[in-house]
Amino acid sequence: MSSVYLRTAGVVCAVLILGGCVARKPASITEAQPEGPPKPMACVPAKSGDPMVGTWYSNSKPRGVSGDFQALTVLYADGRMAYETQLKIGRKTRPALRETGCWSVVDGIYTMQTTQSNGEIVDAADPIYVNRYRVEKVEKTKLTLRELKTGGQVVTARRMPQGYRLPY
């Protein structure tokens, strides 16, 4: 009886396995369509005579960083921006970032949206590429901003001549 039982169980298993193979539909193979290059972001031109248009240099000592953080920001009237930073520790200067993108001021909030970092196109949806500051004061030769976070640091920049570059 056990050999009949084993034979029957073997036949049932074989039928189930074959039935499973017959009932399955072949998986359709779809090729991934390559994504096209991301569409460039359209910058919004600044208002005519906007006092923030120009070249701004700041030198600060961020919390938790031992050294001077230097930043050069160029804000163009057409809404484009270029942002370059370097960190100076003692006599050594370390270049950090070279970013380009768009800028705007809405309701007293200055926003920089990076579209390229060190020559590479970035994911515009990534929040690391958006910097926001409250505009505290804009003078002819001085710009005062505050980071938009609890206990945000004040950043003071001074206007530089067009074409000014960071000292290396």
Predicted region positions:
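Lipid interaction determinants
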Residues: 7-10, 21-106, 111-168
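Sec-dependent bacterial lipoprotein signal peptides
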Residues: 1-19
